[in-house]
């Protein structure tokens, strides 16, 4: 006999839905690489994450596919955290402080098919492109007005997201499915990949809210340094 109380998978997307439902107007502040301060909220984050989820599906991204980011802490990167994992794909966050040779190795080893990058990494991406056979789409995390100097094959993030209406329901699947992928700095040998699941990320998020954790609540304002 199995219990039926709260018998649902621990999905990352459900955390965003909780925030949208109960804290829709709570402010989220970030700064873009274009030096613009962006003030958003959980309602807008949810809508744009769903638009990006639709964008990824339109690109042909499927569950289990790796989607890489080479980016700083911005509102667009946050949207990707939820959008990529939300459709069952794996967000592959690449450490921009690694050597170019290590970044090349990591992207190829993970076989990431899409690369989202901040405009500060345009020249790095251009130099690496010939050595990245698995990457089929390059997305500059900016708008059309800031595409000067971007690699020729790059597409502006905002143009892609604007093509979708955000009318999307997050799928429910195995909570043990991979949600994100990080690589070590390669202290010995090449960097090693570490896979996180929806379940592990969900439980970690709950733990930081506990009294013996960071004791965070909806009453707190936090500055995240990732």
Predicted regions mapped to residue ranges:
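A short N-terminal helical cap/helix-turn-helix that marks the beginning
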Residues: 7-29, 47
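Conserved adenylate-forming
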Residues: 56-61, 167-177, 181-225
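Structural core segment of the AMP-binding/adenylate-forming
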Residues: 15-17, 58-59, 86-162, 173
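Conserved AMP-binding/adenylate-forming core of the ANL superfamily
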Residues: 28-74, 78-82, 99-104, 156-159
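Short hydrophobic alpha-helical segments of the AMP-binding
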Residues: 77-85, 91, 201, 208
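Conserved G/P- and acidic residue-centered "switch" motifs that form tight phosphate/ATP-binding loops
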Residues: 67, 88, 187
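Conserved AMP-binding
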Residues: 71-74, 95, 216, 222-226
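A broad, structural micro-motif
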Residues: 39-40, 98, 155, 173, ...
């Amino acid at each position: 006999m199995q219990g039926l109380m709260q018998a649902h998978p621990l999905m990352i997307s459900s955390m965003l839905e909780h925030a949208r439902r109960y804290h829709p107007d709570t402010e989220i502040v970030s700064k873009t690489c274009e030096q613009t301060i962006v003030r958003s909220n959980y309602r807008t984050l949810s809508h744009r994450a769903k638009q990006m989820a639709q964008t990824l599906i339109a690109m042909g991204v499927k569950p289990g596919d790796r989607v890489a980011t080479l980016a700083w802490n911005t509102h667009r990167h946050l949207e990707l955290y939820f959008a990529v994992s939300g459709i069952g794909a794996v967000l592959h966050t690449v450490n921009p402080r690694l050597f170019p040779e290590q970044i090349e190795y990591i992207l190829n080893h993970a076989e990431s098919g899409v690369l989202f990058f901040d405009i500060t990494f345009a020249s790095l991406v251009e130099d690496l492109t010939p050595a990245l056979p698995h990457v089929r789409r390059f997305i500059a995390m900016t708008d059309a007005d800031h595409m000067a100097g971007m690699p020729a094959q790059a597409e502006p993030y905002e143009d892609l997201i604007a093509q979708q209406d955000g009318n999307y329901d997050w799928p429910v699947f195995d909570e043990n499915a991979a949600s994100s992928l990080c690589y070590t700095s390669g202290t010995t040998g090449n960097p090693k990949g570490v896979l996180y699941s929806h379940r592990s990320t969900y439980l970690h998020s709950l733990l930081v809210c506990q009294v013996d954790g960071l004791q965070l609540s909806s009453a707190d304002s936090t500055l995240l340094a990732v």
